[in-house]
Amino acid sequence: MVDQARARRLAKRISEIVATAIEYEVKDPRLRFVTITDAKVTGDLREATVYYTVMGETIDAEPDYDAAAAGLAKAKGVLRSKVGAGTGVKFTPSLAFVLDKVPDAAREMEELLARARAADAEVARVAAEARHAGEPDPYKTDRDDAE
C-alpha cells in the first residue's frame, strides 16, 4: 500500500497531464468540449480513474457524451504515454475514463432550490396580505363581564 498523500499528488498530476494533452496535443474534434474534473488512483498506483464532463457547443445544445467517450477511448494510449512521461513513476497507471455526473446533479439541485425559493416567496407574499379571522382580541376579560 502506498502513502495516501502520494496517491493524491499523483492523481492531481495525472488530471493535469491529461487535461493539457487533450487541450493542446490530441487533435480529435470529439474532445473539443471535454473537461477533466478529477482523477483517482488505486492504492497500488496501477490504475487511474479520470473523471470528465462534456459541454455542448452552445449553452442550449445537448452535449454529445457518446462521441466524447469514443474519442477518449481512442486517445487512451496516447494519453497514457503522456502520463508515463510526465509522472516518472515506475509503472504507468492504466487509465479509465468515467463521465462525471456531479455538474449535472448540481444543476438539477440549483433548479430545485430556485423553485423552492419561488414557492417561499409566494407563501411570504400571501402571509403578508393575510388577516386574522375573528376579533382582534378573542379572549374575554373581566372588563367585558362588568359591562
From Swiss-Prot:
Alphabetical list of SUPFAM superfamilies matching this protein: Ribosome-binding factor A, RbfA
Biological process according to GO: maturation of SSU-rRNA
Region (Disordered): 127-147
GO molecular function, a single term: ribosomal small subunit binding
Cellular compartments annotated: Cytoplasm
The keyword Cytoplasm is annotated on this UniProt entry: yes
Pfam families on file: RBFA (PF02033)
Intrachain disulfide bonds: none
Keywords: Cytoplasm, Ribosome biogenesis
Domain of life: Bacteria
Alphabetical list of Gene3D superfamilies matching this protein: 3.30.300.20
Transmembrane segments: none
UniProt key word Transcription: no
PROSITE patterns: RBFA
One of the record's GO cellular component terms: cytosol
Main location: cytoplasm
Stored HAMAP family: RbfA (MF_00003)
NCBIfam families in the cross-refs: rbfA (TIGR00082)
Homology family: Belongs to the RbfA family.
Subunit structure: Monomer. Binds 30S ribosomal subunits, but not 50S ribosomal subunits or 70S ribosomes.
Function: One of several proteins that assist in the late maturation steps of the functional core of the 30S ribosomal subunit. Associates with free 30S ribosomal subunits (but not with 30S subunits that are part of 70S ribosomes or polysomes). Required for efficient processing of 16S rRNA. May interact with the 5'-terminal helix region of 16S rRNA.
Protein name: Ribosome-binding factor A
Name of the gene this protein is made from: rbfA
